[in-house]
Swiss-Prot record:
Residues 5-81 form the GIY-YIG domain. It comes from the Viruses. PROSITE patterns: GIY_YIG (PS50164). This is Putative GIY-YIG domain-containing protein 242L. InterPro entries: GIY-YIG_endonuc, GIY-YIG_endonuc_sf, UPF0213_domain. The lineage of its organism: Viruses, Varidnaviria, Bamfordvirae, Nucleocytoviricota, Megaviricetes. It holds the Pfam family GIY-YIG. Disulfide bonds: none annotated.
Amino acid sequence: MEEKNGWNIYMVTMKNGNIYTGISNNVLKRFDTHCNGKGAKCLRGKGPLKLSWFSKANYSHGEAASLEYTIKKQTKKVKLQIIKLNVLDVKTFLNGKMK
């Protein structure tokens, strides 16, 4: 069975400047869940939260999870570049960074 595309990667900035990376098939709904203290435990009490970036491309769940893992391993500097440049193709961007 082939999986439908529709997953996005997103980054949330906490008030202390830390960046959380996650995946969702509905980024705005997931961000709202985080803001209401019902999402990831590591974000609870760390607000105000800011949805800093999310991928424009829709990935399969597997691709999104793999890219999320790759982004989480990056330095804060690289994550801030993705946010600042509003990277549209994060996969290509990261492949260029890892060479």
